Amino acid sequence: MVILGVNVDHIATVRQARKTFEPDPVMAATLAILGGADGITIHLREDRRHIQDRDLKILREVVPCELNLEMAATEEMINIALNIKPDMVTIVPEKRQELTTEGGLNVIELKDSLKEAIKKIKDAGIPVSLFINPERNDIECSKDIGADMVEIHTGYYSESRGDVQLKELERIKDAVAYSISLGLKTNAGHGLNYYNVKSIAAIKGLRGLYIGHSIIARAVLVGIEKAVREMKNLIKEACINA
C-alpha cells in the first residue's frame, strides 16, 4: 500500500501571515495523523517563510510516525538535520523568490555538493531522498551519489490536462519503474490533488505520496481529519484496483 505523507507547511503560512501563534502546524499534524496520515512533512526554508525551527523541534518530539524534513543542501540545514534527526530528509531545490518548489533538483550539475551533503546526513543514520524530475539521467545520478530514495516531481503532470497530462503520466511511470530497477525507494509528489491522485497512486512499486496544499485547502472547509481520510481512501482505492 502506498503511504501518505501530509505536508503541513500551509498551516504555518496562515500563522505567519499575522506573525501570531495560530494555527499551529503541530496541532494540525496531530489531527492529520488521526485522519490516517502515515507521516508528516515540513519544509524548513532558509527564509523561514512558514515553518519555524520551533515547529521542527516539537514535531520531532510528538510525531509517532515518519517525520520527513524537506530542506536545501546548505550547511545550516544539514546541521539542523543532524541535531534534530528526522526519520528522513528530502533535499529540494530552493529559491527565495519562488512561491513553492518549482521543479526537481539539477542533480547532475550539483552532484558533487549533493554527494557531500548526502554522506553527512547518512553518516548520522538518516535516510536521504532527492526531489527530482522524472528523468532517467537524474535517477541514475541520484543512485550514483548515494541517495536512498527519490521523490519524483509530479508538478508538470498536475498542471497539465488531456493528452499532455497522459504523456506526463507515462514519463512518471517510466521514471518510477527505472528508479525501482536501480534499487531506489521511490516516492512522488507536488501538485497532487483529489482529482488527479489516483493515476499516480496506482503506479506499481511506488512507496509513498507527499501531498500538502490540496489537503490543507480542503481542510479549511471540512476539517483536517476528514480531508486526510478522503485522500487516504482515494489512494487505497487506486492501489486495490491497480
UniProtKB/Swiss-Prot annotation:
The record marks 151 as: Transition state stabilizer. It is found in: Cytoplasm. Pathway: Cofactor biosynthesis; pyridoxine 5'-phosphate biosynthesis; pyridoxine 5'-phosphate from D-erythrose 4-phosphate: step 5/5. Its EC number is 2.6.99.2. One of its GO terms (biological process) is pyridoxine biosynthetic process. 1-deoxy-D-xylulose 5-phosphate binds at residues 9-10, 45, 50, 100. The keyword Transferase applies. Gene3D superfamilies: Aldolase class I. It comes from the Bacteria. InterPro entries: Aldolase_TIM, PyrdxlP_synth_PdxJ, Pyridoxine-5'_phos_synth. It catalyses: 3-amino-2-oxopropyl phosphate + 1-deoxy-D-xylulose 5-phosphate = pyridoxine 5'-phosphate + phosphate + 2 H2O + H(+). 3-amino-2-oxopropyl phosphate binds at residues 7, 18, 191, 212-213. Homooctamer; tetramer of dimers. Catalyzes the complicated ring closure reaction between the two acyclic compounds 1-deoxy-D-xylulose-5-phosphate (DXP) and 3-amino-2-oxopropyl phosphate (1-amino-acetone-3-phosphate or AAP) to form pyridoxine 5'-phosphate (PNP) and inorganic phosphate. This is Pyridoxine 5'-phosphate synthase. The gene is pdxJ.
